[in-house]
């Protein structure tokens, strides 16, 4: 079962998050029919976005957008404080041979010429936006760079996805480690040593390690778990929302739809759900609109 934990370690000097996201990424793969390299890219992005979302409170939410200039196009993920994530990729049918390390070549798919941006909606008038250049294209390092440079928190992000031969997801998950102000050199060097020795995160999940055990591997000590929360792929789209969008087109455009096709189909970017509007429904919307 997918879930996320929030924890502290080293007498509260280190804040940590870890998650198993296999089912969540599998749902995205199923909905978007992503090929393996695209699955790894969207899965890593969703996992990191989930953990960034877990740092928020209440109704706060955020959107992550990655545009690296690669063949995959843009990757967009929405996450909130409740463990819900949805995401899409411009070109889901992208796959390459494995790279020199024998891993899915996410860097080649994402590209290295572009930006990673995070827009936070904290319920205030203005959104908080942080943007960094893509430094790696492998995404874990890029999210690390975002946290260090945009949020000024020394951090390490690990995200991984393993894909089955039939394109379904074998394992997915990740961790974020953050050093709080006043962390001593000894703690820092211990964690750096641990990070340099651990196996790839997706391998740890494939082996059956829980998020708690993953953090123990990463930190070199048992973390103090503060909160455990279920996580899932969740999209907030609905037919009502698309009705509102159609109303916004105005009478003429709705009339054109009726005359040209006699119906309309709306598809949600984030979850690929399709909503069909019949001729009668379109006529009702046309008569309702004031524009």
UniProtKB/Swiss-Prot annotation:
Coiled coil: none
A GO CC term attached to the entry: cytoplasm
Signal sequence coordinates: none
Keyword terms, alphabetized: Chaperone, Cytoplasm, Disulfide bond, Redox-active center, Zinc
CDD domains in alphabetical order: Hsp33
GO molecular function, one term: protein folding chaperone
Gene3D superfamilies assigned: Hsp33 domain, HSP33 redox switch-like
PTM characteristics: Under oxidizing conditions two disulfide bonds are formed involving the reactive cysteines. Under reducing conditions zinc is bound to the reactive cysteines and the protein is inactive.
Compartments, as annotated in UniProt: Cytoplasm
One Pfam short name: HSP33
Disulfide bonds: 235-237, 268-271
BP GO annotations: protein refolding
Family that this chain belongs to: Belongs to the HSP33 family.
Function: Redox regulated molecular chaperone. Protects both thermally unfolding and oxidatively damaged proteins from irreversible aggregation. Plays an important role in the bacterial defense system toward oxidative stress.
PANTHER family: 33 KDA CHAPERONIN
Record protein name field: 33 kDa chaperonin
Organism of provenance: Bacillus velezensis (strain DSM 23117 / BGSC 10A6 / LMG 26770 / FZB42) (Bacillus amyloliquefaciens subsp. plantarum)
Gene: hslO
């Amino acid at each position: 079962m997918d879930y996320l934990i929030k924890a502290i370690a080293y007498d509260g000097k280190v804040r940590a998050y870890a998650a198993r996201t296999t089912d969540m990424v599998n749902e995205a793969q199923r909905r978007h029919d992503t090929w393996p390299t695209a699955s790894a890219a969207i899965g890593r992005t969703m996992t990191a976005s989930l953990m960034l979302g877990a740092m928020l409170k209440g109704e706060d939410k955020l959107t992550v957008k990655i545009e690296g200039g690669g063949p995959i196009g843009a990757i967009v993920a929405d996450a909130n404080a409740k463990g819900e994530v949805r995401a899409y990729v411009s070109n889901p049918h992208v796959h390459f041979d494995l790279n020199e390390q024998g891993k899915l070549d996410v860097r080649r798919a994402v590209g290295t010429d572009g930006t990673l941006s995070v827009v936070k909606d904290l319920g205030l008038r203005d959104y908080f936006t942080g943007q960094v250049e893509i430094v790696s294209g492998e995404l874990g390092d890029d999210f690390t760079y975002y946290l260090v440079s945009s949020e000024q928190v020394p951090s390490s992000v690990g995200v991984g996805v393993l894909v089955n031969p039939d394109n379904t997801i074998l394992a997915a998950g990740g961790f974020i480690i953050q050093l709080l102000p006043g962390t001593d050199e000894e703690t820092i060097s211990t964690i750096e040593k641990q990070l340099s020795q651990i196996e790839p995160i997706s391998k740890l999940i494939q082996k059956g390690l829980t998020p708690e055990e993953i953090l123990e591997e990463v930190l070199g000590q048992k973390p103090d778990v503060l909160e455990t929360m279920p996580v899932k792929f969740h999209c907030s789209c609905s037919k009502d929302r698309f009705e509102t969008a159609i109303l916004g087109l105005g009478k003429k455009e709705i009339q054109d739809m009726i005359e040209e096709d006699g119906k309309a189909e709306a598809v949600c970017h984030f979850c690929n759900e399709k909503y069909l509007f019949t001729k009668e429904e379109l006529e009702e919307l046309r008569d309702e609109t004031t524009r």
